[in-house]
Amino acid sequence: WRMVYDNNVNTIVMLTKAREGNEEQSAIYWPSDIGEQMNMKSITVTLVSDETDGPALKRKLKIERGAISRTVTQLHYTGWNSTSCPEDGRDVIELVNKMQENIRSTGDGVALI
């Protein structure tokens, strides 16, 4: 989260499921319940909202460091298995479009993929 905060990241794109079957594919690095907080040293992350937006789950996260807070959007695409590629590329194109829309709507931010 320090890298996200220090580099003014406003959009995170995650392209894998957290779990496939019994295997962990990625650590869950965000709070799971709305209003829940995760504290990592000097940074607090709070889940503000969680909804389905086209091919992705869209999470709004508030990152606080001291008195400064920022909003980060995570677009979590779960249609890409670790052993294959998406059957329909249109979902990936829609995801890229949603990422670009989010970057434009929030100003001078950076995307982390």
From Swiss-Prot:
It catalyses: O-phospho-L-tyrosyl-[protein] + H2O = L-tyrosyl-[protein] + phosphate. Residues 1-113 form the Tyrosine-protein phosphatase domain. This is Tyrosine-protein phosphatase 15. It holds the Pfam family Y_phosphatase. GO terms for molecular function: protein tyrosine phosphatase activity. It comes from Styela plicata (Wrinkled sea squirt). Keywords: Hydrolase, Protein phosphatase. InterPro entries: Prot-tyrosine_phosphatase-like (IPR029021), Protein-Tyr_Phosphatase (IPR050348), PTP_cat (IPR000242). It comes from the Eukaryota. Belongs to the protein-tyrosine phosphatase family. SUPFAM superfamilies: (Phosphotyrosine protein) phosphatases II. The gene is STY-15.
